[in-house]
């Protein structure tokens, strides 16, 4: 049985750090991957590189491998390690060979530590109306299963029924403890993080905790004042347009914005004056009467002035 030179296989030095070894592994794994490589021995080389990475990527295993390499010419090492001529050593034999050469205590001391599972992050779209109250949502996602090389081996579908609290905001993260990937060697599971994405609304724009809505009004409604029906997230309200209102003017409706634990925002109605279509002869005459009555009014009087 031959103790392979894993450093030579990876093309690195024993003094190189994990980052350098990882870079070499990724390069060689891409080069010899059976699905893309045209090398005749690609599959064998790929397995050899993966085997070297499995040992050298683990701090404890690497230290033990270095110790084995250092003692490879000792008589005790040769008696234990070369018991089966013609067979090649691989990473799966590591535990048994190490404990045979260095004793049971060494095997116990090198057990891999408990490792926490990976966190998973998924985006959840929420409508503005749904932010007003707590609601239930069914979440489906794939739970990745990693192999010894840290690569995803398969994905297991998983479904959860979760509660989305009232008042969630865009970009808010909700933690579901232990719903990520399983831990290793008794380590805790990772977490599932729900990242809230507030879906765009056809009528409302979000400004902090407040909402803005553009309200179309006619010229005479703006001039004379009026009451118009305006939608909110809960219901429609009757909004008072004061006489002499201007285009772009913002009218505040208290308490009709977004809801959070700390405060409730307001709704701002932004007035947009909409002209009627091309006037007929009678309508044009009325506009002309208005123009004559307001002949002293100059809308550009202060134009360009600071």
From Swiss-Prot:
* InterPro entries xref list: DNA-bd_curved-DNA, DnaJ_C, DnaJ_domain, DnaJ_domain_CS, HSP40/DnaJ_pept-bd, J_dom_sf
Gene3D superfamilies per the UniProt record, alphabetical: DnaJ domain, Single helix bin, Urease metallochaperone UreE, N-terminal domain
Keyword Transmembrane helix: yes or no?
Answer: no
Annotated GO molecular function terms are: bent DNA binding; unfolded protein binding
Q: Which UniProt key words apply to this protein?
A: Chaperone, Cytoplasm, DNA-binding
What's its job? DNA-binding protein that preferentially recognizes a curved DNA sequence. It is probably a functional analog of DnaJ; displays overlapping activities with DnaJ, but functions under different conditions, probably acting as a molecular chaperone in an adaptive response to environmental stresses other than heat shock. Lacks autonomous chaperone activity; binds native substrates and targets them for recognition by DnaK. Its activity is inhibited by the binding of CbpM.
Domain (J) spans 5-69
The identity of this protein, by name, is Curved DNA-binding protein
One GO cellular component, as annotated: cytoplasm
Predominant location category = cytoplasm
Subcellular location as annotated? Cytoplasm, Nucleoid
Query: Which Pfam families is this protein grouped with?
Result: DnaJ, DnaJ_C
Encoding gene per record: cbpA
Give the originating organism: Escherichia coli (strain 55989 / EAEC)
Q: Which SUPFAM superfamilies match?
A: Chaperone J-domain, HSP40/DnaJ peptide-binding domain
Q: Name one GO biological process term.
A: chaperone cofactor-dependent protein refolding
């Amino acid at each position: 049985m031959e103790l392979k030179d894993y450093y030579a296989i990876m093309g690195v030095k024993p003094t190189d750090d994990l980052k350098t070894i990882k870079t070499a592994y990724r390069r060689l794994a891409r080069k010899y991957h059976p699905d893309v490589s045209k090398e005749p021995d690609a599959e064998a080389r790929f397995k050899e590189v993966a085997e070297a990475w499995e040992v050298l990527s683990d701090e404890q295993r690497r230290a033990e491998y270095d110790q084995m390499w250092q003692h490879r010419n000792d008589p005790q090492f040769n008696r234990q390690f070369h018991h089966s001529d013609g067979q090649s050593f691989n990473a799966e034999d590591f535990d048994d060979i190490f404990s045979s050469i260095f004793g049971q205590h060494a095997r116990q001391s090198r057990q891999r530590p408990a490792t926490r599972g990976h966190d998973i992050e998924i985006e959840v779209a929420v409508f503005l109306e749904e932010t007003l109250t707590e609601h239930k949502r069914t979440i489906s996602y794939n739970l990745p299963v990693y192999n010894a090389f840290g690569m995803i081996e398969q994905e297991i579908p998983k479904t959860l029924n979760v509660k989305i609290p009232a008042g969630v905001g865009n970009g808010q993260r909700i933690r579901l403890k232990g719903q990520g990937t399983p831990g290793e060697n008794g380590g805790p599971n990772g977490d599932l993080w729900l990242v809230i994405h507030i879906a765009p609304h056809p009528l409302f724009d979000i400004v902090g905790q407040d909402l803005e809505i553009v309200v179309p009004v006619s010229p005479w409604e703006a001039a004379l004042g009026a009451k118009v029906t305006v939608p909110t997230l809960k219901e429609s309200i009757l909004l008072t347009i004061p006489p002499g209102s201007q285009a772009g003017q913002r009218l505040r409706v208290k308490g009709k914005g977004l809801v959070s634990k700390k405060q409730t925002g307001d709704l701002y109605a932004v007035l947009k004056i909409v002209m009627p279509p091309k006037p007929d002869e009678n309508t044009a005459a009325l506009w002309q009467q208005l123009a004559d009555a307001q002949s002293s009014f100059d809308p550009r009087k202060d134009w360009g002035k600071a």
